[in-house]
């Protein structure tokens, strides 16, 4: 600890005579601290109120997310306070964003309950996000020590075992969300599933708010969907599936629906992010016990991940969900209708699919992360994608991904089955070109046009959606330009 810091930090009896101290004088600011391999590290984007010292604001974040309260308390002397205080050890200005700072904060591993996302999030994104001296606060990234990672089960099935169960290798998986997502009867819903699977898709899925409504009870949907899956498997000779959304009001209801899906022979169930971290982990444990693939729809994430100055980055949510144990997560498309900067999305996909993430600031990854043999998490791309973008999707997202063409299947002018066939032919043509060593990225339109010459459904798809793009600036791009630290 340097001399300047010693003069700031009040210790001993003087500390308990002081009443209210600045957080940086209470030990939450330690610029000489070297994080331990066993520390949990969080990176916050801190925007202090006008006139608030950025170091004091960052120290306050460390304090309020660990052991501090607004005044000095005598009971600190009954604990290993030096050990349990979170330590802000670095504060850097955010490039090209005056008034905002990156605060690096280390937390002792003993501050967290093993294997609990609920406990982790209660500390890291709890009361501190309502702290008055802060104009805005965003959790940008986290690093978890291997000792902590090993307390979680990780994805229940994982990419390798999922591909083995489906007997599908060497290409992205194809899916579609049933549209319209609300209003169909169970019988008509099942018809959509059958036609899409028979046409060449691997999966269909419920949407986030397809639960159990007056027009379609969940049990009816499950029965008609699994009848469709079984008929499509018999017709094509391929393993098929449909994501049956078991999201409900209570855990008891969700377990009941999941058990019924299992009884019907489903290989996969689905939940929504909005059910909460404890429910997600509970369903992940159920899925592992029952050999079921678990799909997570990230419904609701945009309320706190999209704004660059306040909230939680989706890269953090992706890390939490890999720990929690889901097998699929929607992670962006780059070219679709939903938020997704190419570099930022690449970072999300690397979090899901790699055994080890090196620090890669250009992708928004501020820390090296070892995943300690946890299974890999299959990212899902959905929202405004179509067959004409197949070369771009393969280039940006790789082959370990589920490409979900909802409107791009069900909106086909020749019908649902034709829409599915168009997507399957486009994918197979692009994979063949890649395997032959062709420059499929630049030759993509030519490859698709050649395939369409002998496939009317693909030709129709290319004609209908050839001019459909979603070229909007992303609101969440990486900030990685090196700058001088204010801690120097």
Swiss-Prot record:
Record GO terms (molecular function): magnesium ion binding; monooxygenase activity; ribulose-bisphosphate carboxylase activity
Keywords from the UniProt entry: Calvin cycle, Carbon dioxide fixation, Lyase, Magnesium, Metal-binding, Monooxygenase, Oxidoreductase, Photosynthesis
Site positions for Transition state stabilizer: 337
Active-site residues per Swiss-Prot or TrEMBL entry: 179 (proton acceptor), 297 (proton acceptor)
Amino acids binding Mg(2+): 205, 207-208
Reaction(s) this enzyme catalyzes, per UniProt: 2 (2R)-3-phosphoglycerate + 2 H(+) = D-ribulose 1,5-bisphosphate + CO2 + H2O; D-ribulose 1,5-bisphosphate + O2 = 2-phosphoglycolate + (2R)-3-phosphoglycerate + 2 H(+)
UniProt record, GO biological process: reductive pentose-phosphate cycle
Disulfide bonds: none
InterPro entries: RuBisCO, RuBisCo_large_chain_AS, RuBisCO_lsu_C, RuBisCO_lsu_C_sf, RuBisCO_lsu_fd_N, RuBisCO_lsu_N_sf, RuBisCO_lsuI
Transmembrane segments: none
Entry EC no(s): 4.1.1.39
Positions where N6-carboxylysine occurs in the chain: 205
Domain of life: Bacteria
Cofactor remark: Binds 1 Mg(2+) ion per subunit.
Annotated positions binding substrate: 127, 177, 181, 298, 330, 382
Record-linked PROSITE patterns: RUBISCO_LARGE
Pfam families: RuBisCO_large, RuBisCO_large_N
Cofactors: Mg(2+)
Gene3D superfamilies given in the database record: Ribulose bisphosphate carboxylase, large subunit, C-terminal domain, RuBisCO large subunit, N-terminal domain
Family: Belongs to the RuBisCO large chain family. Type I subfamily.
Miscellaneous note of the record: The basic functional RuBisCO is composed of a large chain homodimer in a 'head-to-tail' conformation. In form I RuBisCO this homodimer is arranged in a barrel-like tetramer with the small subunits forming a tetrameric 'cap' on each end of the 'barrel'.
Function: RuBisCO catalyzes two reactions: the carboxylation of D-ribulose 1,5-bisphosphate, the primary event in carbon dioxide fixation, as well as the oxidative fragmentation of the pentose substrate. Both reactions occur simultaneously and in competition at the same active site.
Subunit structure: Heterohexadecamer of 8 large chains and 8 small chains.
PANTHER family named in the record: RIBULOSE BISPHOSPHATE CARBOXYLASE, RIBULOSE BISPHOSPHATE CARBOXYLASE LARGE CHAIN
Protein name: Ribulose bisphosphate carboxylase large chain 1
Organism encoding this protein: Bradyrhizobium sp. (strain BTAi1 / ATCC BAA-1182)
Species classification: Bacteria, Pseudomonadati, Pseudomonadota, Alphaproteobacteria, Hyphomicrobiales
Gene it is expressed from: cbbL1
């Amino acid at each position: 600890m340097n001399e300047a810091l010693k003069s700031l930090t009040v210790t001993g009896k003087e500390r308990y005579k002081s009443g209210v101290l600045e957080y940086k004088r209470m030990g939450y600011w330690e610029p000489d601290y070297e994080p331990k391999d066993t520390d949990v590290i969080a990176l916050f984007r801190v925007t202090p109120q006008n006139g608030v010292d950025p170091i004091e604001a960052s120290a306050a974040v460390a304090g309020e997310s660990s052991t501090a309260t607004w005044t000095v308390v005598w009971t600190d002397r009954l604990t290993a306070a030096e050990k349990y205080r979170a330590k802000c050890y670095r504060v850097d200005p955010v490039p090209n964003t005056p008034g905002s700072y990156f605060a690096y904060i280390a937390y002792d591993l003993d501050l967290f309950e093993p294997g609990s996302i609920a406990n982790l999030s209660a500390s890291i994104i709890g009361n501190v996000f309502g702290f008055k001296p802060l104009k805005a606060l965003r959790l940008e990234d986290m690093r978890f020590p291997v000792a902590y990672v090993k307390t979680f089960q990780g994805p229940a099935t994982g990419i390798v075992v999922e591909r083995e169960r489906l007997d599908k290798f060497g290409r992205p998986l194809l899916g579609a969300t049933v549209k319209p997502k609300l209003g169909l009867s169970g019988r008509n819903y099942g018809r959509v599933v059958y036609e899409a699977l028979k046409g060449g898709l691997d999966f269909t899925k419920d949407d986030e708010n397809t639960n159990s409504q007056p027009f379609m009870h969940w049990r009816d949907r499950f029965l008609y969907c699994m009848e469709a899956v079984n008929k499509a498997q018999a017709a094509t000779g391929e393993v098929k599936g449909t994501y049956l959304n078991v999201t409900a009001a209570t855990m008891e209801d969700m377990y009941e629906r999941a058990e019924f899906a299992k009884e019907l022979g489903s290989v996969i169930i689905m939940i929504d992010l909005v059910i909460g971290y404890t429910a997600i982990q509970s369903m992940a444990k159920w899925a592992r016990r029952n050999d079921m693939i678990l799909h997570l729809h990230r419904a609701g994430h945009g309320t706190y991940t999209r704004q660059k100055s306040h909230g939680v980055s989706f890269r953090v949510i992706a890390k939490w969900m890999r720990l929690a144990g889901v097998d699929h997560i929607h992670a962006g498309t780059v070219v679709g209708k939903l938020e997704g900067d190419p570099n930022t999305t690449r970072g999300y996909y690397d979090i899901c699919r790699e055994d080890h993430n090196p620090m890669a600031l250009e992708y928004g990854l501020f820390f090296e992360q070892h995943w300690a043999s946890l299974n890999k998490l299959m990212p899902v791309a959905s929202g405004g994608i179509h067959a004409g973008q197949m070369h771009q999707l393969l280039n940006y997202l790789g082959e370990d991904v589920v490409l979900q063409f909802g409107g791009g299947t069900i909106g086909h002018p020749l019908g649902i089955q034709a829409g599915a066939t168009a997507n399957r032919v486009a994918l197979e043509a692009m994979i063949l070109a890649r395997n032959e060593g062709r420059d499929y990225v630049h030759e993509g339109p030519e490859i698709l046009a050649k395939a369409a010459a002998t496939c009317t459904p693909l030709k129709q798809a290319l004609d209908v959606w050839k001019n459909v793009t979603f070229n909007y600036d992303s609101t969440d791009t990486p900030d990685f330009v090196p700058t001088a630290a204010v801690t120097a």
